[in-house]
């Protein structure tokens, strides 16, 4: 299922500013040209010699169809319940809707540094699940190759678009702009899922992004329920009126 197969209205999601990096309310995916809404954003950093050092700031965008899709099981849960729920974030990761990730640099990184750390996290996830195969090993090689000659100064961004079918589109930007097309497409569903899993999943590198996604989706699912109830009431009233006329 994609937004073109099952169009949903774009949720009202205000922009977020995280450590001087602004994430707009919506973006157009370089993989599909679909408009996705901002699910949440947060920093990735480490405690170094008693000081928290921020390396990157990460924004996560979702297809609007994710809201009714997730509402089936998770509507009514609080932000706290969703934040602590591994199955909820797993459902976002594997859900049949498009996702987009924007990773903006706060400190300079080389493509090699970034890609080696990401693939290290991905391989750890696969091995813990017992699903690391030759196909994934080849996808990792391709991922490392795409990043090999890249450098990312502060303010530059790495962009990932995850299709419902499982492809991972990789793009780069030296500023806040998002290119219309990606630099490379890697056809490996597990790699695409693992990139997002490493950010907001069980062993996430950005607890802040995970919290914001839970917070925003809890509110959007609540609003979705109100809209569904209103539509249902309108339909029932219309049916009652129709029956009254027939009688």
Swiss-Prot record:
Residues the entry annotates as binding substrate: 56, 121, 198
Entry EC no(s): 5.5.1.6
Enzyme class: isomerase
Pathway(s) annotated for this protein in UniProt: Secondary metabolite biosynthesis; flavonoid biosynthesis
Site description Important for catalytic activity, residues in chain: 114
Composition-biased stretches (Basic and acidic residues): 223-235
Key words of the record: Flavonoid biosynthesis, Isomerase
Top-level lineage group: Eukaryota
Stretches for region Disordered: 223-247
SUPFAM superfamilies linked: Chalcone isomerase
Physiological role: Catalyzes the intramolecular cyclization of bicyclic chalcones into tricyclic (S)-flavanones. Responsible for the isomerization of 4,2',4',6'-tetrahydroxychalcone (also termed chalcone) into naringenin.
Protein name in UniProt: Chalcone--flavanone isomerase
